[in-house]
A protein has these predicted regions:
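Sec-dependent N-terminal signal peptides of Gram-positive bacterial secreted proteins and lipoproteins
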Residues: 1-29
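Loop/turn elements at helix/coil->beta-strand transitions in domains of secreted/extracellular proteins
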Residues: 65-68, 77-79, 91-94, 129-134, ...
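Active-site/substrate-binding loop(s) of hydrolase catalytic cores
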Residues: 92, 106-110, 115-235
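Active-site-proximal beta-strand/loop segments in catalytic clefts of secreted hydrolases
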Residues: 72-74, 86, 98-101, 136-140, ...
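C-terminal accessory segments enriched in acidic
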Residues: 3-6, 26-49, 187-188, 196-207, ...
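Mid-chain, structured segments of secreted extracytoplasmic proteins
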Residues: 81-88, 93-101, 105-113
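Soluble metallo-hydrolase cores and metallopeptidase-like ectodomains found primarily
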Residues: 45-93
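Alpha-helical scaffolding within the catalytic cores
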Residues: 81, 150-160, 268-274
Length: 351
């Protein structure tokens, strides 16, 4: 369904002058080997609320003829879960971008919203003719709004709300993926019933945040990536996932503010990266950006001074991915970099 209403709220994009994929100039020191912790205060008030995000999506839907806005289901607390769709030809390859399975990992959502705006600027002329794009921002809206059935009094962020990893029922949505669909939490259940079961998806990037102290080669990472590591996933699916990772790595690593490591992740089918690849044959990539928007452990949260580069990193990732899929250059990507990409470790917190 297409929804048409006026936007009623502020946009973080306009606040930060992030109108295009170029976003904002970021000093190289902001990421690689960047600040250890205390990188500015953690302010949730500058982030989109659920309500302002919905208004933003409706405004973009009104402006963009290529975009359709669909409600795929509801959260535990009854919030509609939105998906932005760009489908020009059912025969095109399709990519899904998923953000905020964990509610306290929001800057990837801010980047996804900027990318949606970017898709309506004309700077992707021709791209949308050759790839279908599905974007689900803020899957876990209850956790993002702190509207949960447990206490968040130990969380550290300042602002108008706290954000938590878990959904309203205190469940980690990224551990639901091995269950029967009917046994999943509502947010995961609707993702499966109304997206993964409905659309012929070829690629997916699952966007997350991690703590602030992950490093490789003595430098703090700006993000880490990983393909499906469950042994039951088809080898061709894994190889295509590695090619997807190659697109992301070769886009970000050469930039002065980018430093990418290999994520040290599990192989369980209950994790989205593995379970979705195993169940549907979708080539998936996990991207863990540096720092969270809120947490009860201080070293996990990254302050607002780092917001710009994390948003830019997300937009660059999504833009490069759709272009590589659209022109089929992803099929020629060299995956050998994975053989030498260091697996991240955690730097000791000196504070």
């Amino acid at each position: 369904m297409t929804l048409k209403k006026k936007i009623l709220s502020f946009s973080l994009s306009s606040m930060m002058a992030l109108g295009t994929v170029t976003v904002v100039a970021i000093p190289a020191s902001a990421v690689g080997n960047g600040p250890n912790a205390g990188n500015g205060s953690v302010q949730t008030s500058i982030l989109h609320t659920y309500e302002s995000m919905v208004s933003y999506l409706k405004e973009q839907d009104k402006k963009q003829s290529a975009m359709d806005l669909e409600v795929i289901g509801q959260t535990v607390k009854g919030r509609d879960i939105y998906m932005a769709k760009y489908i020009s030809n059912p025969d095109n390859p399709t990519v899904l971008f998923l953000t905020q399975q964990h509610g306290n990992e929001q800057l990837t959502t801010e980047g996804a919203l900027d990318f949606i705006k970017h898709l309506g600027t004309g700077k992707t002329k021709g791209v949308l003719d050759n790839v279908n794009i599905l974007i689900i921002p803020m899957l876990n809206a209850d956790g993002a709004m702190g509207d949960v059935n447990f206490s968040l009094e130990d969380y550290i962020a300042d602002g108008d709300r706290h954000l938590t990893r878990y959904n309203a029922n205190n469940v980690d949505l990224n551990r639901e993926h091995a269950k029967d669909i009917m046994d999943m939490e509502p947010e995961a259940k609707f993702l499966y019933e109304n997206v993964l079961e409905k659309y012929p998806i070829d690629y997916m990037i699952d966007l997350h945040h991690q703590g602030t102290l992950s490093e490789t080669n003595g430098e703090l990472v700006s993000g880490s990536i990983l393909y499906p590591t469950n042994s039951e996933v088809d080898a061709e699916v894994v190889e295509k996932s590695k090619k997807l990772g190659s697109v992301v790595y070769n886009t970000l690593e050469p930039k002065g503010w980018g430093h990418i490591g290999q994520y040290n992740g599990g192989s369980g089918a209950n994790i989205g990266r593995n379970g979705i690849a195993l169940r549907y044959g979708i080539s998936t990539l996990l991207f863990e950006m540096r720092g969270m928007s809120d947490h009860y452990i201080e070293s996990y949260a990254l302050g607002q001074k780092s917001n710009g580069y994390l948003i830019k990193q997300t937009v660059s990732t999504l833009d490069a991915t759709v272009r590589a899929i659209a022109d089929r250059s992803i099929e020629k990507e060299d995956t050998s970099f994975w053989d030498t990409l260091p697996t991240q470790t955690n730097r000791q917190n000196d504070e």
